[in-house]
Amino acid sequence: YGFLSENAGFAKLCEENGIVFIGPKSEVISAMGDKDTSRQLMQQVGVPVVPGTEVLKDVEEAKKYAKEIGYPLLVKATAGGGGKGIRVVAREEDLADAFHTASREAESAFGNGDVFLEKYLTHVRHVEMQILADQQGNILCLGERDCSLQLNKQKVLEETPSPVMTEDIRRKMMDAAVLAAKAANYTNAGTVEFLLAPDGQFYFIEMNTRLQVEHPITEEISGVDIVKWQIRIACQVPLNMKQEDIRLQGHAIECRINARSTGRVEFLHIPGGGRVHFDTALMQDTVVVPFYDSMLGKLIVHANTREEAIRRMEASLCEMVIVGVETNIEEQLQLIRSKIFQKGNYDTLILDKILKKG
């Protein structure tokens, strides 16, 4: 919905009817929303991508390329997202089932069942770069967000800056994100997503041609109102900042508060205080139904250091009360208090282990 959604067909309808769409052009949404097309474009301009294939005709072709890439690998839908249309395959015997399942799932969810193969990288982090691009050709990068803490390929907690990012890797990844935006003729707000390997190598995985759920943590450390700039850029206002003007200050964390059940919110207490806020539409007596995304809101904290931000988030989670609907607040507390998180030594597969340990 709104700024958090992307639909090339809707953007095109706006263009055809003289309505200014706040976002990139429809053809850019189409191109970058297709993982195969965007992957090929990145290869052409020299942005590193994960080893993989183009769209595959059938299972037999997939088996042939799988032998070249090596197992484990991913079967990915070109139109996939949010964990849909993606399967991990550890051996050839499972490839056919994964191929058909991912294709059917993507066809049902996105109307496009095309799939391709990609090497499955282990012990990686999911790091994304926030960009703003105006209609005059200026592009800014507002730094990274570490979104590695995921359950079922759904983000649970995000932080910025990434606790493992060096200045050298950050600069290279920012340059790659700007290069990706230029190659796509991108305008407005967007996010370029990468996998970061333990050896410091990073690989483009996709570009989100919209505002991300987790954008507020970037706003906190950069002082840039991303949504305001989305509207200004759509009105052809040029960016009034240069890259060297962007000063990233402090550390910000976002915890997604999700419903674990349906029901009526009988009591609600939202934490307050300086540099703490809860983005939500939730109110007392709100009825949570099963038809939509389970996220109830985003708890965001900002502090001078990562350690202080962790303490502030822990206190805020302890203060938050939602009665009548089961939530993941206790799981978020468990995560924030874990030694693995506090050391910053985590990857995309670690959350299951943290929650199982208790």
Residue ranges and their predicted role:
Residues 15-78, 85, 262:
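A conserved helix-loop-beta module that forms one wall/lid of the active-site cleft
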Residues 1-8, 27-31:
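Short, solvent-exposed turn/loop segments enriched in Gly/Ser/Thr/Pro and often Arg
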Residues 4, 8, 15, 19, ...:
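ATP-dependent carboxylate activation and anion-phosphoryl transfer catalytic cores
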